[in-house]
Amino acid sequence: MLLIPAIDLKDGQCVRLKQGDMDQATVFSEDPAAMARHWVNQGARRLHLVDLNGAFVGKPRNEAAIKAIIAEVGDEIPVQLGGGIRDLNTIERWLDDGLSYVIIGTAAVKNPGFLKDACAAFGGHIIVGLDAKDGKVATDGWSKLTGHEVADLARKYEDYGVESIIYTDIGRDGMLQGINIDATVKLARSMSIPVIASGGLSNMADIDQLCAVEGEGVEGVICGRAIYSGDLNFAAAQAHADKLGAE
């Protein structure tokens, strides 16, 4: 089980939001590259970056911070980025800059043709981010709820060659209420694309539950507020997951 620290970027700083609300941002570091180094030193094997400003305006914003992170750790572990990625030129530029994966969210829902083109052009590098509340997909930085069922949409992406799907339960994100295991497993079982869980990870019990369903197609989990607030020790959690995985 891959535990993936999240570095959410707003105005060049590393922050955490509550339920995607830009007005409820807690700044954890003014040096995102140093934060990236910290998580790698703690045993992270991949990093998850979110360009929050980019997600809201639909084009890259925090470019200096992202490039600094890639320069700091990009040669050591894969780095993935979501937020504001809505055209092929942006994908190409980020991959050329050293990102391993780009995450397409809103654009994958609104423009499946774009997702198909992206997978064809950059196979193996495209992750889809599906954000949902009560099983329904949300877009535009979670500000709009669609009528799409998560599983229906995800199954359509199987033929495209999507690398994995990050499934976020937005009702739980940043609230430390525990991962929605049932919804995550249900999605993973419904298709062949591996799922990365997100939203609400809070303690070792969540890690135990996730490791128990790894065989169902849940390959990782995004770690956010819990590893910043101290509720979860990242190094201990990854070591624990590795131990469970070896049993």
Swiss-Prot record:
UniProt catalytic activity: 1-(5-phospho-beta-D-ribosyl)-5-[(5-phospho-beta-D-ribosylamino)methylideneamino]imidazole-4-carboxamide = 5-[(5-phospho-1-deoxy-D-ribulos-1-ylimino)methylamino]-1-(5-phospho-beta-D-ribosyl)imidazole-4-carboxamide
GO biological process assignments: L-histidine biosynthetic process; L-tryptophan biosynthetic process
Entries under Pfam families matching the protein: His_biosynth
Active site (UniProt): D8 (proton acceptor), D131 (proton donor)
Residues making up the signal peptide according to the UniProt record: none
Coiled coil (residue ranges): none
Cited Gene3D superfamilies: Aldolase class I
Broad EC category: isomerase
EC number annotated for this UniProt entry: 5.3.1.16
InterPro entries in alphabetical order: Aldolase_TIM, His_biosynth, HisA_bact_arch, Isoase_HisA-like, Isoase_HisA-like_bact, RibuloseP-bd_barrel
GO cellular component, one term: cytoplasm
Functional pathway: Amino-acid biosynthesis; L-histidine biosynthesis; L-histidine from 5-phospho-alpha-D-ribose 1-diphosphate: step 4/9
Annotated compartments: Cytoplasm
Family statement: Belongs to the HisA/HisF family.
Full protein name: 1-(5-phosphoribosyl)-5-[(5-phosphoribosylamino)methylideneamino] imidazole-4-carboxamide isomerase
Organism of origin: Cupriavidus metallidurans (strain ATCC 43123 / DSM 2839 / NBRC 102507 / CH34) (Ralstonia metallidurans)
